[in-house]
Amino acid sequence: MLGDGKEGTSTIPGFNQIQFEGFYRFIDQGLIEELSKFPKIEDIDHEIEFQLFMETYQLVEPLIKERDAVYESLTYSSELYVSAGLIWKTSRNMQEQRIFIGNIPLMNSLGTSIVNGIYRIVINQILQSPGIYYQSELDHNGISVYTGTIISDWGGRLELEIDKKARIWARVSRKQKISILVLSSAMGSNLREILENVCYPEIFLSFLTDKEKKKIGSKENAILEFYQQFSCVGGDPIFSESLCKELQKKFFHQRCELGRIGRRNINWRLNLNIPQNNIFLLPRDILAAADHLIGMKFGMGTLDDMNHLKNKRIRSVADLLQDQLGLALARLENVVKGTISGAIRHKLIPTPQNLVTSTPLTTTYESFFGLHPLSQVLDRTNPLTQIVHGRKLSYLGPGGLTGRTANFRIRDIHPSHYGRICPIDTSEGINVGLIGSLSIHARIGDWGSLESPFYELFEKSKKARIRMLFLSPSQDEYYMIAAGNSLALNRGIQEEQAVPARYRQEFLTIAWEEVHLRSIFPFQYFSIGASLIPFIEHNDANRALMSSNMQRQAVPLSRSEKCIVGTGLERQVALDSGVPAIAEHEGKILYTDTEKIVFSGNGDTLSIPLIMYERSNKNTCMHQKPQVRRGKCIKKGQILADGAATVGGELALGKNILVAYMPWEGYNFEDAVLISECLVYGDIYTSFHIRKYEIQTHVTTQGPERITKEIPHLEGRLLRNLDKNGIVMLGSWVETGDILVGKLTPQVAKESSYAPEDRLLRAILGIQVSTSKETCLKLPIGGRGRVIDVRWVQKKGGSSYNPEIIRVYISQKREIKVGDKVAGRHGNKGIISKILPRQDMPYLQDGRPVDMVFNPLGVPSRMNVGQIFECSLGLAGSLLDRHYRIAPFDERYEQEASRKLVFSELYEASKQTANPWVFEPEYPGKSRIFDGRTGDPFEQPVIIGKPYILKLIHQVDDKIHGRSSGHYALVTQQPLRGRSKQGGQRVGEMEVWALEGFGVAHILQEMLTYKSDHIRARQEVLGTTIIGGTIPKPEDAPESFRLLVRELRSLALELNHFLVSEKNFQINRKEV
């Protein structure tokens, strides 16, 4: 990205670069670092020594391809081999062997790993950087209390605080604190050394009492005092080696290991020059920190902003994988120790290969990718989603924050985020501000800091030489950084005027001559999602946030279409997502079909397999369509085949459709959307979805389960699609309830159900007669479609732990329907409320009916005016057959630049098409349109245009659900919750109030008793419904009331209830 040859030029970096660089750093540095830490292992008698020679490690190329790993549910990994030596000290003999340590999952070209056939991605985490931080808080008297917090590499904290008598304490736990002199003495310093190494010895001497002198008289006394306070132990503990080890393990290892980043930060903050390889906290650090704290008390020095990015570090893929390798090697060390002692005990001669097993490394990485919170299943809804997922930054995870504990200041946008973390793109809900997204040009530096690029402007001539710099958050505070207008092309005017700039987290207006650096790109401070929104500068940030989230939920359509109005980043996103097939070198196409493209180049013939109807983990359809013809010559980097949601190598998530902003009979009230039937019959918003259904065969105690077509007691109609093996045939159309895989599970029948001849066989020959239970895979509700693939995965060693898995893939074609969610790129979302015949839709002056009607009231209050600009410019583009790519913040060139562009294009479209209604000067951008039902014009002119509208993955087919009867919760006896459990609809507190307000007593009673948790009453309802007659009233209490009584009894409170007769007011007491 840094172009040194051509000064002042830069290109957009690869969007997966962060992941690739992290993995490369792990393979190149992290692997060797961890292997070099592996200790020499000796037996108890010190006769045998085992060691690894990490200089000769080797990673072997995987035997399987990525696609096969996904198909067979395997891990795409590389085998790690290291040379190991076993030395017999008595004879000085050494046996050296190349040993297999385990498998390390590899990263593929998408920046993801394939583990057990599933694409997984590791998220970057933001943590508080290890080092020291000074802060002040007000106590209950309103006096400032200064504290210095030392944060270790593991996240452990040691707090130094100064009281009003200028005494310095180290807080070792929430309740206990000890004098700084005791801590320094316990760490190995005597009083003379302490006083020689501090700037204010008189302050240290001032709180040195006789009692304190006794505590620090010797190192042993100091350690005992420290141990007593730290462990809250009463009495007089005795100094011993085990006591020192316990302190070392519980305190010094957790709270005093700084790591290389922590050592660098402390050296910089306290002005020390301790060597970088000293990664533990030293007495000198403690004393320098105390000096600095005293200076703070007297008004010298500055406090630290904990939320500034210079005080944060990024824990990347490299760090996480390296930590796991260290963990695996520690487990391997224990295994080797155990094996050596076992071999000596049994008088066996060990070899390096016998001592080492590959299980610790392989299982550690499998559990890391499967269970670690920062390892997530790659979201593959569309190409944008795949790329954005790998660029997330999370404050959550081990050592980080939680959604419940994080305060508002941490979630808020900080000035240091500028050009590093996107101020717009974050999740909604409890994790808002805790999960961010990397800005386009940001990169992770060597010390775990986020760096952003700037152009350096030289003093003498602001034009002649321009150089590009990458600055960390701690460096860019010292520069005047121009923003906004400084990017204008008209440099002549610019030099005469003042420009907005950023300096030390403040925004100033300064003369152009004073500028040191300037931004390199209009998109520099945004993430990819936000950079795809045209006219984003005219939108409220909340709506831009929703839009960048909703673009990730867009479903790839069966016929994709490029946006007329875009930002120019669409091509880069599509290329980096790996969805289109791209030529790796030039050549000539020899053959092409839907399955593969064959071309010759460099004297070789290459065959590129295409993805055909592959399921993503969000059930969307991934498919590649060839874009080249036979005999055509191609160049390196040319698009060979388009993928899902790409057209000509550009991202294409939605459709440009004709939209009017107007109310229509209340059908678009409150974000509802009215659409034309053309969108359904023209397959404009039709998408394909592939669902996976699987079943496993186990070996039970009664014998193995069988896959068969011969299923007793089932109608032949349900088995019509099965082949002779009992598995559904490819290409068959299946409906709800059909059998996909026939399976019988052996089951021993009860004694009473045996036939007499079975009993005779059992008595004479001892043969156990088994009957089979039908456990077939049936198609659930809403699953109807076409079977497009069947996979029978048989894992090696087909034991009961490795069952055979049969997977059936069914494709569904879904047109747009009432209840589906659609959205624009400006946070304007809505649910389809009605599908109108095309003749009833409002139509334009040239007779074209509108495709979609939005509510105009959704624009002013939400302040997302960008959609109006996009809408009008899209209309002009469709009439002129042009596509526009507009960078954000075009107002830096001139005022009202967006509006001028839109109106000039509309005027040109009006002239070229000879349609004066396209641009009418009285109400520019609006037009008179007609009611399709009556043919009369509407009273007011209406904004019409062609915005880019997406269909989202929230579809009514996945949400709609009904329940007549089903399962009940065991404790409350109320229906379960959720669609997956066939649950019921909750009637909550507010729903009860609504029914009470209408006075519908009987409906309310039904909902709270028969339909819910009154066990006897609901059984009676079933009987009376079948026989006919009136439903009897429930007489006793429902189960939830009985549950309340039981819970009160557990608190020793007895609650009795009575039934009062309506006729004679007789009180009838009943036991609950």
From Swiss-Prot:
Transcription regulation is among the record's keywords: no
GO molecular function: DNA binding; DNA-directed RNA polymerase activity; ribonucleoside binding
InterPro entries in the cross-refs: DNA-dir_RNA_pol_bsu_ext_1_sf, DNA-dir_RNA_pol_su2, DNA-dir_RNAP_su2_dom, DNA-dir_RNAP_su2_hyb_sf, RNA_pol_bsu_bac, RNA_pol_bsu_CS, RNA_pol_Rpb2_2, RNA_pol_Rpb2_2_sf
Sorted UniProt keywords: Chloroplast, DNA-directed RNA polymerase, Nucleotidyltransferase, Plastid, Transcription, Transferase
Compartments, as annotated in UniProt: Plastid, Chloroplast
Main location: plastid
PROSITE patterns xref list: RNA_POL_BETA
Top-level class of the enzyme under EC nomenclature: transferase
Quaternary context: In plastids the minimal PEP RNA polymerase catalytic core is composed of four subunits: alpha, beta, beta', and beta''. When a (nuclear-encoded) sigma factor is associated with the core the holoenzyme is formed, which can initiate transcription.
Family from the record: Belongs to the RNA polymerase beta chain family.
Protein name: DNA-directed RNA polymerase subunit beta
UniProt organism field: Barbarea verna
